[in-house]
UniProtKB/Swiss-Prot annotation:
Residues at the catalytic site: D237
Remaining remarks: Eukaryotes lack the canonical genes for de novo biosynthesis of queuosine (Q), present in most bacteria. Therefore, this molecule must be sourced from ingested food and/or the gut microbiota, and metabolized to its corresponding nucleobase, queuine (q), before incorporation into cytoplasmic and mitochondrial tRNAs. Incorporation of q into the anticodon of some tRNAs contributes to translational efficiency and accuracy.
Species this chain originates from: Mus musculus
Origin superkingdom: Eukaryota
Biological process terms in GO annotation: nucleoside salvage
Protein name: Queuosine 5'-phosphate N-glycosylase/hydrolase
Function: Catalyzes the hydrolysis of queuosine 5'-phosphate, releasing the nucleobase queuine (q). Is required for salvage of queuine from exogenous queuosine (Q) that is imported and then converted to queuosine 5'-phosphate intracellularly.
Family of the protein in this entry: Belongs to the QNG1 protein family.
GO MF annotation list: hydrolase activity
C-alpha cells in the first residue's frame, strides 16, 4: 500500500463510501448561513485574543509553547460530565484542552522550563504527573502516553532541529503542506493514519493544528506566511462532529446514534470512528465553500475564509453552546491522535 491520501482527499473518499455517517447538504447550507454574519470578521490575528492562555508573543518561545501543547493536544474528554480534570490558573479553573494550557503556563510561572526540549526530553513520569496535576480528584487522561511523547518528541527535536521548533518551521519554506509533512515524517506521535475500504488514509489532526497554530501565533507573517494555508483542513477531533450534528450538517445512522448515546467506546481506526472523522472534515470543507459563495455574493470586500478559521470558530461555538448540545453525543475514543 502506497502513501496515504491527504487529509482532504481522505475525507472526500470516506464521505463517498460512508455507511453510518452522512453529510447533509441542506444542513451544510443552513450552517453556512448561520455562520455568515460572523465570518466576514474572522482574522488570523484574533487567535491571541481568542483566549487569555494563548501566548502573546510571535517569537521562538511562543513557537516552543505551541509545539509542546500540540504534541500533547489529545483526549481531554471526561468519563462523566460532572467529574472532570480541572487546572486552576490565575484564579480560574480550566477544563479540557485549556486545562493543558493552564498547566503549561502554571509550570512556566513556577520556573519549570517545560517548553524547553532539553527539559522534556528527559523529564520523568513523576515530574509529568506533578506538572499536569489536576486541581480536582480526576487526573488528566493518558498520563503515561503524555510522558512517553514528551521524551520521544524532545529527543527528536534536539537531534534533528537543534532543540527548536522554529528551525523546523524555517525548513518548510513558508509552506503549510511542507511543514505538515516535516512534522509527520519526523515525529511518530503525529502520524494519525488509518485504513478504510482498502485505502490508506490520513487525518493528521495534531499535525494540522500545529501548522495552524504556527500560522496563528506568527499572525501569518514572516516564517508563518503560508501561502497555502487554505490547503489545511479542519482538525478531526471528538467535539467538531458533535457541533456539526447539532447544526444538522452531519447525520448519524440509528445504529451509530444508539451506540453513542449509550456511551460505547469506539476504537481508533474502527470503521465508524473513521467515518465520523472523515465526514466531519468533508462537511467543514463544504461549509467553507458555501460560506465563500455567500461572501462573494454579498457587499463585503473579499475575505479569506479557510478551514482553519472555520474550525477555530466552530470549536468556540461548541464551548459557548455546551448546554444546548447536551442531547447530542460525542464519540468516545481514547487515543493520542485527538
Amino acid at each position: 500500500m502506497g502513501p496515504p491520501l491527504s487529509p482532504r482527499e481522505s475525507a472526500r473518499f470516506v464521505a463517498e463510501n460512508s455507511r453510518d455517517v452522512l453529510v447533509d447538504h441542506e444542513g451544510v447550507r443552513r450552517a453556512a448561513e448561520l455562520l455568515l454574519p460572523a465570518a466576514a470578521a474572522w482574522r488570523v490575528e484574533q487567535w491571541k485574543s481568542l483566549h487569555e492562555l494563548n501566548p502573546r508573543g510571535a517569537d521562538e518561545a511562543a513557537l516552543g509553547w505551541v509545539f509542546l501543547v500540540d504534541s500533547l493536544n489529545f483526549s481531554f474528554w471526561a468519563e462523566r460530565e460532572d467529574s472532570k480534570c480541572a487546572v486552576r490558573y490565575g484564579g480560574t479553573p480550566y477544563t479540557g484542552y485549556w486545562a493543558l494550557c493552564a498547566a503549561v503556563n502554571r509550570a512556566l510561572d513556577q520556573g519549570i522550563p517545560i517548553t524547553s526540549a532539553s527539559y522534556y526530553a528527559t523529564v520523568s513520569l513523576e515530574q509529568v504527573r506533578d506538572i499536569f496535576r489536576s486541581d480536582t480528584a480526576v487526573p488528566m487522561p493518558l498520563m503515561e502516553e503524555r510522558h512517553r511523547i514528551l521524551n520521544e518528541t524532545g529527543k527528536i527535536l534536539l537531534e534533528k532541529f537543534g532543540g527548536s521548533f522554529l528551525n523546523c518551521v524555517q525548513k518548510s519554506g513558508r509552506s503549510a503542506q511542507k511543514l505538515m509533512q516535516l512534522i509527520v515524517e519526523n515525529f511518530p506521535s503525529y502520524r494519525d493514519e488509518a485504513e478504510f475500504e482498502g485505502k490508506r488514509i490520513a487525518f493528521y489532526k495534531r499535525a494540522q493544528i500545529l501548522v495552524a497554530d504556527t500560522w496563528s501565533v506568527l499572525e501569518g507573517k514572516g516564517d508563518g506566511c503560508f501561502e497555502d494555508i487554505s490547503s489545511i483542513t479542519m482538525f478531526a477531533d471528538y467535539r467538531l462532529p458533535q457541533i456539526l450534528v447539532y447544526l444538522g450538517a452531519l447525520k448519524y445512522s440509528d445504529e451509530l446514534l444508539k451506540k453513542l448515546l449509550k456511551g460505547e467506546m469506539l476504537l481508533n481506526g474502527d470503521k465508524q470512528e473513521v467515518e465520523i472523522r472523515g465526514c466531519s472534515i468533508w462537511c467543514v470543507e463544504l461549509i467553507r465553500d458555501r460560506l465563500l459563495e455567500l461572501l462573494e455574493k454579498g457587499e463585503n470586500s473579499p475575505v479569506e475564509i479557510n478551514s482553519v478559521l472555520l474550525d477555530y470558530h466552530l470549536w468556540d461555538y461548541a464551548r459557548e453552546h455546551r448546554e444546548d448540545m447536551k442531547g447530542v453525543p460525542f464519540h468516545r475514543t481514547r487515543c493520542i491522535y485527538y
